[in-house]
Amino acid sequence: MKKRTILWLMLAFFVLVLGACGQKTSQDKSDKTKGMKIVTSFYPVYAMVKEVSGDLNDVRMIQSSSGIHSFEPSANDIAAIYDADVFVYHSHTLESWAGSLDPSLQKSKVKVLEASEGMTLERVPGLEDMQAGEGIDEKTLYDPHTWLDPEKVAEEAQIIADKLSELDSANKDTYQKNAQNFSAKAHDLTKKYQPIFEKANQKTFVTQHTAFSYLAKRFGLNQLGIAGISPDQEPSPRQLTEIQEFVKTYKIKTIFTESNASSKVADTLVRSTGVSLKTLNPLEADPQNDKSYLENLEENLAILAQELK
């Protein structure tokens, strides 16, 4: 872990020096761009920053096509961050590489914003009693998937609006108004689906990993994750047996897989239990459609509501 941190810092230093050498070229490019140049870490953060910024700023993301859990920024990604006015990421809990870059970024012109700063994060299901230390990083004990709960999304959008308002006070009213409009739509989603899930006959759903804990808690549901907090993490044979028994005992009809993860484990359960497969989108990667963030989020709610009714 120390070697990886040192490597990131060395790479960051190299990019910083390279950026200084080409400062005139970067400045010429920035002059043609309206507002601030904002780089974001992955899709949910990008979508929220874009909603709050509207057309005021140039908002981009460095990760778009894969899950954020296994993402490592390339040299070009880091160069893009150092070329930005503002870098926004979700949390140290999720993007540990951002924490490695943070000290050197603080010495540059780039303003670094943690979008979930101040939010209350829940413990990862099953790790509530585990203590940090002896090789266990405290950050890994907390669930970062706040972007799948409409109310948490509204909270994070407001944090982003407040931070951008501090950096760009001339446009504070626009940031705040956009955040309020976005939050109102998020609240409407909660109001729409709360009574639907309250009437649902089935309250438990099985997912490929525990990405939907905040969503489940918000709507009074119970999530059983097949493979823990990461879609790349394989469950043990004992865990698979326990899940098979759970599915049969509670008459689970559907296992929800993810659009950006392997379905090998879920396929094994389908063969052994006879359940069907449906897809929920953890929204870690850009869905590559014309829908708004909240419209993509609502797709998950609609699929769950249909299966649990």
Language model regions located:
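Extracytoplasmic metal-acquisition and chelation regions
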Residues: 20-309
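Sec-dependent N-terminal signal peptides of Gram-positive bacterial secreted proteins and lipoproteins
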Residues: 2-25
